[in-house]
Amino acid sequence: MDIATLVGLITCGVMVFLGIVTGPEKMAGFRHFYDLTSIFITLGGSISCMIIQSKSFGKFIEDIKSIRLAMKVQQAHEAEVIRNIINLSNVARKEGLLALEEAANNIEDDFLKKGIMLIVDGTDPELDRSIMETELGAIDARHNEKINFWANWAGMGPAWGMIGTLVGLVNMLYNMDDMSTIGPNMAVALLTTLYGSLLANWLCVPISFKLKMNNELEIKMKEVMVEGLLSIQAGENPRVIEEKLKSFLAPSVREQINEQDGAAEGGEA
C-alpha cells in the first residue's frame, strides 16, 4: 500500500475536523456541519450523474474500485528496469537471442516478457515496435478512463453542491416571515457547497492526479523497455544500451544509478 496516499487522505480529514472542533463550540459545533438532506443532494446527485456517464453500471463499479490503484505502490523502479534490460542484453550477447526465452521465465512484467518473446520468435524490429507501441496506447487509454472518471466526479461534486445550495435558498426565502430561521437555514444551504468542495478536493482531485502520475510513470518505464528490447534485437553493446536508456531518466536518477553501479563494481573488486 502507498502510505503517502493514505496519510494524505487521513491528514486532510484531520485538518477539517480540527478546523471545526477548535471553534467556539468545540465538539458541540460538529453537529452544525452535518445535514442528511445536503448529503443526499451532493453525494447522491453526483453519483447518479457518474452512473449516467458510465458505459454500464458494472463499468461504474469498476471505476470506483480504481481508487485501490491510487493506494498501490508502483513496483517498477527506473534503475531496476534498466538493470533487467542490461542483464538481458548480456545474455543475448553471450548466448544469442534464443537464450532470452529461458531468461523470460524469470521476468514478472508481462509487457517485458511479451517483448522478449517477440524477439525470440524473430519478428521484424519495426513490427515489434508497432505491436508494443499499440499495446502501450491501449494501456494508456484504459488508465485515462479511470483518471477521467475521478476528474469528472471532481467537477460534479461542487456542481451538485451549488444545486443543493440553491434548493436551500429557495426554501429559506419561502420562510422569510420568521427572521430567526434565516441564519440556520442559510447555514444548511451552504453545507451542500461545503460537501461538494470536500468531495472534489479531498477525494476526487487527489485520486485523479495520483492515477495520472502512476500512469505516466508506468508508460515511461514501458517506453524504456521498448527501446531496450529493440536495442538488444539490433545487437547493440550493453554499455551503449545502458547509456541510451538513462537518457529517459532525470539527471538525479542517472546519478543515483551511476553511484550504485560504482558501488557494485567496487564490491566485486
Model-identified regions with their sequence ranges:
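Large intracellular
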Residues: I3-G8, L18-K146, E218-A269
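Helix-termination/interfacial motifs at the ends of transmembrane alpha-helices
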Residues: V7-I10, V14-F30, G137-N214
